[in-house]
Design a protein with these regions (language model features):
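N-terminal small/glycine-rich loop or linker at the start of catalytic domains
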Residues: 112-137, 233
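Metal- or metallocofactor-binding catalytic centers and their adjacent structured scaffolds
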Residues: 5, 37-113
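Flexible C-terminal active-site loop/helix
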Residues: 4-15, 29, 295-363
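Conserved, mostly hydrophobic/aromatic
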Residues: 3, 34, 41, 69, ...
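Active-site mouth loops of central-metabolism enzymes
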Residues: 128-142, 162-163, 190-196, 240
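Glycine-rich phosphate/pyrophosphate-binding beta-alpha loops
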Residues: 48-56, 134-138, 291-294
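Structured beta-strand/loop patches that form or line metal/cofactor-binding pockets in enzymes
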Residues: 1-40, 44, 49-53, 326-329
Length: 363
């Protein structure tokens, strides 16, 4: 199988509700779809969401990155897979989401060439998963209503977005905790909104109310590594690093410092599947469990995340792959059953993707 062409398309889809964090507000999904074609007619599909506030990438920069890499891949054999992956990452630094979209498409092709679903090619066997759902930041009453709506849909784990106002954040969490049955698990995500000192004070305030979330995600700035360690040494609530980890070296530093309890893996940060798998292995060597998350992105890249979760099910113990459920509609059909909190993989080859010129669909 020889690569003959690489195309890019934009995917736009409305959200059910605005997605609001301490970093940004999003009203509609806009993703880049990457289509890699081979001489035997096999096609691979990848996807990535520009998230300039986190990865520094825009739609324009992602398209430019793919266009820059494209001529170096045309004519290459998929059988030279490892060399192709190494080449992609040697050609340009950073630009992690664009490279992830390319990687996903190439992994899709490789699995199709072996007539296997991607998760089985990667050594995975698990097919059934549960994800949380994100509750966007808003007024307390609205967030409580959104929590009840999510629970009614079958979610038993909610990720609460906070981080814009420290005192209000505590009030939000206390009110939400009090409004829900105690079997509902809460995850907190401040998206870098607090200082280290504030984090300790606010988490202590919650812990005095016997509110210990499943974790607090990235409470401080991405580069505040010492701040993460300061927090971990002073609170009961487990600490999960997100924006602080883009690379293996980022993770190794935090793990060696014993600065975190969990690692959040996102393909858009790890520049694709290859380093995501390596990151899971590294975390396992330190005895630290992982969560696999996603940006606000479409079914192709979310599906890739589920395949990775299956491949590393022994260390990826939590899923935050709710982006498909946040969409009001999208132009894709999927053999992967995204049924709110429940996700079920199929035995379709590769990611299981079928594409027409106008519509990317997952078959």
């Amino acid at each position: 199988m020889k690569i003959t062409n690489i195309q890019t398309k934009t995917l736009k889809a409305p959200l059910k509700n605005p997605f609001i964090t301490s970093l940004r507000r999003v009203d509609a999904l806009e993703d880049l779809v990457v289509i890699v074609e081979c001489d035997d007619g096999t096609v691979g599909y990848g996807e990535g969401a520009p998230t300039p506030q986190i990865t520094g990438e825009t739609m324009g920069s992602m398209m430019a990155t793919v266009a820059y890499i494209k001529p170096h891949l045309i004519g290459r054999e998929i059988e030279d897979f490892d060399a192709i992956i190494k080449l992609i990452h040697s050609l340009i630094v950073k630009n992690t989401t664009a490279k992830s979209a390319l990687e996903i498409a190439l992994y899709d092709l490789k699995a199709k060439s072996k007539k296997l679903p991607l998760f089985r090619m990667l050594g995975g066997t698990q097919t059934k998963f549960s994800t949380d759902i994100t509750i966007s930041m808003s007024e307390i009453d609205k967030m409580i209503v959104d929590c009840h709506s999510a629970v009614a849909l079958g979610y038993n784990t909610l990720k609460i977005k906070i981080g814009d106002n420290p005192q209000k954040d505590v009030e939000r969490v206390i009110a939400i905790h009090g409004a829900l049955d105690k079997n509902i698990k809460l995850r907190l995500d401040a998206n870098q909104g607090w200082s280290a000192k504030q984090s300790v004070e606010l988490l202590h305030a919650l812990e005095r109310q016997n509110i210990i979330a499943e974790f607090i995600e990235q409470p401080v700035a991405a580069d505040d590594i010492e701040g993460l360690k300061y927090i971990k040494e002073r609170v009961q609530t487990p600490l999960l690093a997100d924006e602080s980890i883009f690379s293996i070296n980022d993770a190794r530093r935090l793990l060696e410092m014993q600065a975190i309890d969990y690692v959040n893996i996102k393909l858009a940060k790890t520049a694709g599947i290859t380093q995501a798998l390596e990151l899971a292995d590294l975390s396992k060597s330190f005895g630290v469990k992982c969560m696999i998350g996603c940006m606000l992105e479409g079914p192709i890249s979310v599906a890739a995340g589920v395949h990775v979760a299956s491949a590393k099910a022994d260390i990826i113990s939590m899923l935050d792959l709710d982006a498909v459920s946040l969409l009001a509609s999208h132009p894709m059909e999927t053999s992967i059953d995204f049924n709110e909190s429940k996700i079920l993989l199929s035995d379709a080859h590769g990611l299981g993707i079928k594409y027409t010129l106008s519509t990317p669909t997952i078959n």
